[in-house]
């Protein structure tokens, strides 16, 4: 009996791994942040619950479907070879059904309890990640990183629109900030795992264009983040504290990126981790310094 229980627990754990809990957590945090900004700090608990549930299920379902699509190349990469599908601990067909089921539940919840527009944005996020990125572009072009950024940029917009009821300049500002942040964040990681991606035949920017072009594009995107990150201040979403913090964080981020660009290093996890701190500080300051 205990062996059955243990086996059942192991199966649950493997299915949980398929949903990429770390990424789902980040999606939920940015969605909640968007809701707080969209509601001007006056969150409705019931709406928050349904929005986070619907968005979380969509993110989890997309992660599962991504793993189903990538099961063959995941076997070839050291970083992903221990995932459930490459290991054979979960049947691909069952995983596919699981992923689709999560997506269906997500759409029903969003349409029933949140609204048509947020539901459409959730569907767009899933489509851009599963179809555009995972299925069509990831194995063919380094542009996949930028296109795939659409899905990662939408969670705060989904939260903002769910709370405010419309897509306005502030929602667009949140989208642009997330969209411009993702490529340089990923490219630094892609440099570290370039051999893994090359072995699997994935044309990430370091594999397809080399280290110099990757470092150059990382620098260009980081520089572009500076003006983009100030849009929430210019639109009146936040006040002076955010402006000061954003300027300081951008100068540090740009300085670290310039240092990396001119160095002989081919990877920089320090820059990768700072990019996470950068985003967290900016979003945190937005919430603290929001105009109510």
Swiss-Prot record:
Subcellular location, record wording: Cell inner membrane
Additional record remark: Carbon 2 of the heme B porphyrin ring is defined according to the Fischer nomenclature.
Membrane topology: Multi-pass membrane protein
Gene Ontology biological-process entries: heme biosynthetic process; heme O biosynthetic process
Domain of life (superkingdom): Bacteria
Keyword annotations: Cell inner membrane, Cell membrane, Heme biosynthesis, Membrane, Transferase, Transmembrane, Transmembrane helix
Gene3D superfamilies named in the record: UbiA prenyltransferase (1.10.357.140)
Reaction(s) catalysed by this chain's protein: heme b + (2E,6E)-farnesyl diphosphate + H2O = Fe(II)-heme o + diphosphate
GO cellular component: plasma membrane
Family of this protein: Belongs to the UbiA prenyltransferase family. Protoheme IX farnesyltransferase subfamily.
Pathways involved: Porphyrin-containing compound metabolism; heme O biosynthesis; heme O from protoheme: step 1/1
Known function: Converts heme B (protoheme IX) to heme O by substitution of the vinyl group on carbon 2 of heme B porphyrin ring with a hydroxyethyl farnesyl side group.
GO molecular function, one term: protoheme IX farnesyltransferase activity
EC number from the UniProt entry: 2.5.1.141
InterPro entries given in the database record: Protohaem_IX_farnesylTrfase, UbiA_prenyltransferase, UbiA_prenylTrfase_CS, UbiA_sf
Transmembrane segments: 15-35, 49-69, 104-124, 147-167, 171-191, 218-238, 242-262, 271-291
Protein name: Protoheme IX farnesyltransferase
